[in-house]
């Protein structure tokens, strides 16, 4: 935005993105749950560790240079997408790791997602499908992970952050309320439509569709760094 420093713009964009994910995730969860594609047992086991990662990430995003993190995740997302598109059809691992391994995975998903302002899908879906987890349940469960990530992160950045002096109009904390109001109606409307389409695709096609979305996300992150 005109007159906003790159540092402030990055944090505000991250916080606003996380805030928009909250209502979008709720809409998506309801749609996926109606089709039986949300694994609540996995969510119950992962939620505390996702939350720990989110709280740490919400703090770190306000004190660290987000450019390098965005670059890292742009590379990771792009490579993961290419692997999903061109890699072998079988999962990399035969199943999810043990409890400690899953706790670490959950904490890392929460940490990194909250730091770059993304929902649960970008990291959760590849992580689960690489561990031979059913694609449809991975997508549905990732929607719920998105809520666990975005809600505490958005609250932290909304109320715990000091609004930058160069922030654009209608910014409270680090969240731009005008951007939130403009984006949310569309995301909430289209989330159930996306869930319905996803449920009708076979697993192989669903992975390819998600991989395309993921590579677009990765390239967008890289563009933020280099353009």
Residues of each region from the PLM?
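Small-residue-rich hydrophobic segments that form or flank transmembrane alpha-helices
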Residues: 1-45, 49-50, 103-110, 121-195
